UniProtKB/Swiss-Prot annotation:
Catalytic activity: phosphoenolpyruvate + UDP-N-acetyl-alpha-D-glucosamine = UDP-N-acetyl-3-O-(1-carboxyvinyl)-alpha-D-glucosamine + phosphate
Protein name (database record): UDP-N-acetylglucosamine 1-carboxyvinyltransferase 2
Taxonomic superkingdom: Bacteria
Name of the coding gene: murAB
Cellular localization per UniProt: Cytoplasm
Record-listed phosphoenolpyruvate binding positions: K22, N23
Length: 429
């Protein structure tokens, strides 16, 4: 096991290149199951979730080659092998295998998702969609069993706006007979990205990115080449790090419109940000930052995935800021870790209340989930002294070459193997 050390206080300066979107990649890769010939996806992030998906596609008979961010999948010899246990449990987005395998094979057995523990992440909307298309769905011993004689298009209204359910229903519906309409669909950029891939494969999809998506089922889908969109959450994390510690940081390979909610909040605090077609410039180091209230919402609102890094930055603001997470109420495990570093904050219901300004101090902290890890990295950059972060398996699930990118901007950051004594202490904590 390893820990991440950060010697805080270094100014960040320069350009950072953003990787492909994790939240797109975990849906694009299962979508390749639906094709009848080779699919190439370019620009994938080199993170553990992608390697897990590669292994799962191989497990069901796919021929998969992945290097330098490019994955080539030949799905022709895939079979509808049950995946109730093993690697599938490591992956929160393993549920996309349900929609893709149901779409192609009319059956699937998928172990219930793993990944970050952020309170209940029910998949009832996914199941509602599959049932509407004609599937029989049962939950047996922690795995979802899906079976269908045939899939027929349906009108599906999502009770909750859900990115996962919207994509999963799209995956299952593209090869169904007739027309499917998804109402109250999520509008995230990642949904448009998946729809773009499916359309390149021959699917007929209209309305991706709006709240009504229309799909006309087709008989088969063919291979294609697709380039993934940039990761708006990684870009947002570096914007926050640049705001916290930057002189001038340029975020390269980004779609600025995907980050308007964060850009607006940083400007409200007093930061100077410039945008171009595929870059953002953020000027850090401002004094007398204003406190702001942040409320997470579905896209185009403030992303829940940036709520945690934002709480670290708000320790710099003079006054009281309130961060409310309307998406995942349990996403405040990072608050106790920030308090170990000297932050003045508390949790009330779905909100974190942050009072500043406070000079954070280096400490030993633990990442409980992916974005909590990002928050602690930002806090470590800001802190006086050395911060030791454990729980790196969470960070490695979602950030590609994080230390290398931060080092390139001037941070002092390194990994170390943990001693047996440290591992024992961690396991007992």
């Amino acid at each position: 096991m390893e820990k991440l050390n950060i010697a805080g206080g270094d100014s960040l300066n320069g350009t950072v290149h953003i990787s492909g979107a994790k939240n797109s990649a975990v849906a694009l890769i299962p979508a390749t199951i639906l094709a009848n010939s080779e699919v190439t996806i370019e620009g994938l992030p080199e993170i553990s979730d992608i390697e897990t998906l590669r292994d799962l596609l191989k497990e069901i008979g796919g021929n998969v080659h992945f290097e330098n961010g490019e994955m080539v999948v030949d799905p022709t010899s895939m079979i509808s092998m049950p995946l109730p246990n093993g690697k599938v449990k490591k992956l929160r987005a393993s549920y996309y295998l349900m929609g893709a395998m149901l779409g192609r094979f009319k059956q699937a057995v998928i172990g219930l998702p793993g990944g970050c523990h952020l309170g209940p992440r029910p998949i009832d909307q996914h199941i509602k969609g599959f049932e509407a298309l004609g599937a029989e769905v049962t939950n047996e011993q922690g795995a979802i069993y899906l079976r269908a004689e045939r899939l027929r298009g349906a009108r599906i209204y999502l009770d909750v706006v859900s990115v996962g359910a919207t994509i999963n229903i799209m995956l299952a519906a593209v090869l169904a007979e007739g027309k499917t309409i998804i109402e109250n669909a999520a509008k995230e950029p990642e949904i448009i990205d998946v729809a773009t891939l499916l359309t390149s494969m021959g699917a007929k999809i209209k309305g991706a990115g709006t709240n009504v998506i229309r799909i006309d089922g087709v008989k088969e889908l063919h291979g294609c080449k697709h380039t993934i969109i940039p990761d708006r959450i990684e870009a947002g994390t570096f914007m926050i790090a640049g705001a916290a510690m930057g002189k001038e940081v340029i975020i390269d390979n980004v779609i600025p419109t995907h980050l308007e909610s964060l850009t607006a909040k940083l400007r409200e605090m007093g930061y100077h940000i410039e945008t171009s077609d595929d870059q953002l410039l953020i000027v850090g180091g401002q004094k007398n930052l204003k406190p702001v209230d942040v409320k997470t919402l579905v896209y185009p609102g403030f992303p829940t995935d940036l709520q945690q890094p934002m709480t670290a930055l708000l320790t710099r603001a003079k006054g009281t800021s309130v961060v409310t997470d309307t998406i995942y109420s349990a996403r405040f495990k990072h608050i106790d870790e920030l308090r170990r570093m000297g932050a003045n904050m508390k949790v009330e219901g779905r909100s974190a209340i942050i009072t500043g300004p406070v000079e954070l101090q280096g400490a030993k902290v633990k990442a409980s989930d992916l974005r909590a890890g990002a928050c602690l990295v930002v806090a470590g950059l800001m802190a006086d002294g050395v911060t030791e972060i454990t729980g790196l398996e969470h960070i490695d699930r979602g950030y590609s070459s994080l230390e290398k990118k931060l080092e390139g901007l001037g941070a002092t950051i390194w990994r170390e193997r943990m001693t047996d004594e440290e591992i024992e202490q961690l396991q007992n904590s």
